[in-house]
Regions:
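Positively charged, small/polar-rich N-terminal and surface patches that mediate targeting and assembly
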Residues: 1-121
Length: 121
């Protein structure tokens, strides 16, 4: 078993998984690092528009989960964008409209998972 006390860092027992718009990812990562939270960033895509998103992982003690979520809440905001109808996946190939559709974009989704085992090498 690895001795975690030698690092001086509290042992993480929660994995905070944050899925955010790539528009907000850089600022979120900077704020988390400034708060001394460990960060791993992975590019991803998702949502019904298949736009770029980023998944950020941070292993923290349970006592710090609310602080991490507060940073996500401060940085990641939903926005409204006008999108051409042709780009919507649920519209047929022959669809055409001169008027774009307003769609909610961005924001974030947070999952908090228990860590059963943690090892640092």
């Amino acid at each position: 078993m690895v001795d975690h006390t030698s690092t001086g860092q509290p042992r993480p027992d929660r994995l905070v998984m944050m899925i955010v718009s790539d528009t907000d990812a850089e600022e979120l990562q900077s704020r988390l690092v400034a708060g001394h939270y460990p960060v791993t960033k992975v590019g991803s895509t998702g949502g019904f528009l298949r736009r770029g998103s980023v998944t950020i992982f941070s292993g923290v003690p349970q006592s710090q989960v609310d602080a991490v979520i507060a940073i996500v809440d401060e940085v990641c905001h939903a926005r409204r964008e006008l999108v051409p109808v042709q780009t919507l996946p649920f519209i047929g190939d022959g669809a055409f409209s001169a008027e774009p559709v307003e769609v909610r974009m961005g924001g974030g989704v947070v999952f908090v998972l228990p860590i059963e085992r943690y090892e640092r090498f």
